[in-house]
A protein has these predicted regions:
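N-terminal auxiliary "cap/dimerization" subdomain that precedes the catalytic jelly-roll/cupin core
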Residues: 1-43, 139, 155-156, 167-188
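Short hydrophobic/aromatic beta-strand or adjacent loop that forms the aromatic wall/cage
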Residues: 3, 79-81, 158-160
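A short glycine-rich, His/Asp/Glu-containing loop-to-beta-strand
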Residues: 43-63
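Short His-Asn-centered micro-motif
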Residues: 56-57, 69-72, 143-146, 163
Length: 188
């Protein structure tokens, strides 16, 4: 079992009934309102002691589109997102630095998203990293976003919706804890 991605058997559609995937922006990365999330999903997460505060949508079109290798925070940490991915021909790679004592592999710390100027994350140089895991993302999956990772779309359109998981004290939920919370939903 890997420590980067767990596909789930969770039959709750992420969006409200009156919100279509086509209603979401078609920019590469978008911060969207928690109000679009299905109330049944919010209730389910609340029962598990989980709050969400950040909801993002992604739109990757075209053949061989590669996101920049990045972490969803200014520095490496242990942070979990719940993700729903639409599309057939995509994977996510996770990376680790060749030399974890050398932080020169960060090429753009505290980067902002060009579409809205508010994103805070770090981009990495591929030359200094080794792939440690590759996986197709399920519908939904728990993914580790506190280490370098990258979505790759081979063909067609890839859409995804992600939520950062927080506990009741507003701390981000690390992957081992998320795996424990969702253990009865993890697919083999």
């Amino acid at each position: 079992m890997n420590e980067y991605c767990f596909n789930l058997n969770l039959d709750i559609y992420p969006l409200r009934n009156d919100v279509s995937l086509d209603d979401l922006p078609k920019e590469q990365w978008n911060l969207i309102s928690v109000d679009v999330i299905n109330p049944d999903l919010l209730s389910f997460l609340k029962l598990k002691g989980i709050n969400i505060s950040v909801v993002s949508s992604f739109y990757d079109s075209g053949t061989n589109f590669e996101q920049k290798i990045h972490i969803d925070f200014p520095t490496m940490c242990d942070m979990t997102k719940l993700i729903w991915a639409w599309g057939e021909h995509h994977v996510m790679n996770w990376y680790m630095p060749e030399d974890q004592n050398n932080l020169e592999f960060v090429i753009d710390k505290n980067s902002t998203n060009p579409s809205n100027g508010i994103r805070n994350y770090s981009v990495y140089d591929r030359q200094s990293l080794n792939v440690v895991h590759t996986s197709k993302i399920g519908f939904p999956s728990l993914i580790q976003v506190g280490i370098p990772h990258q979505g790759i779309n081979f063909a067609g359109v890839r859409r995804s919706l992600t939520v950062i998981l927080h506990d009741e004290k507003n701390n981000v939920i690390p992957m081992n804890r998320a795996r424990s919370i969702f253990k009865s939903y993890i697919l083999p």
